[in-house]
Amino acid sequence: EIISFKNSYHGSTHGSLSVSGNESKKFAFRPLLPDVKFIEFNDIEQLQEISEKTACVIMETIQGDAGVRIPSTEFMRALRIKCTETKTLLILDEIQCGMGRTGFMFAFQRFGIVPDILTLGKALGSGMPMGAFIAPFEIMNALSNNPPLGHITTFGGHPVACAAALAGLEILKEEEIIKNVENKGALLETLLQHVNIVELRRIGLLFAIELSSPTAVQKVVKYCHENGVLSFWFLSCPESFRIAPPLNISNSDIKKGAEIIVEALDRL
């Protein structure tokens, strides 16, 4: 069996839909993969569902489309221990939260654990299409036979996409962008205190701003777009909208953006 988490989102292909925990995105594509079980996110007691018959657990380190749901360090470490005890592969999906977004190169580093398999995408390609499946040699080697070359792709390793990804990695390292992410996120958070905000959830420079209703969110997003701030509501959490600025955003642009968001909130 495979274990995933309720309200998770892993993509739109057959396999990734099968392990995504939002039925509204899946119903039109059934039947999907069998023997996929969904448990509650960030609930240590639910980890008892993991057993020796569990092939893998797949999880977004930070649930993105569910509205920036951040697990506790206690939960993450208990998950790692349980997977190790049952010889279950732990797969962490950092397609949204990886590449410095949380203030670490990889979000799992915040919790002091290491997965067996890591998936990356989005920011990895620096604007070009690029995804990555990262694992130790023994796991990667298992994919190289039965059948031989059974996992290949026409455009895998595309030179231009790889060059863009490498350039982005070098800039993240050379310009020390990641070390400033937490301070920039904290600055923006202090500027977004408002009576119309029900809850603000943040990790690094990834925010979810929860309002009273999806209608209120749509009004704020529309005003922000019209005034130069790009945002969007979460498809699986429409009462919240996302703020995920560039990691190298300046403090002055943070202040300008916050002013526009506050103006939008004032108009509710």
Residue spans for each PLM region:
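Conserved N-terminal phosphate-binding loop of PLP-dependent enzymes in the Aspartate aminotransferase
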Residues: E1-L268
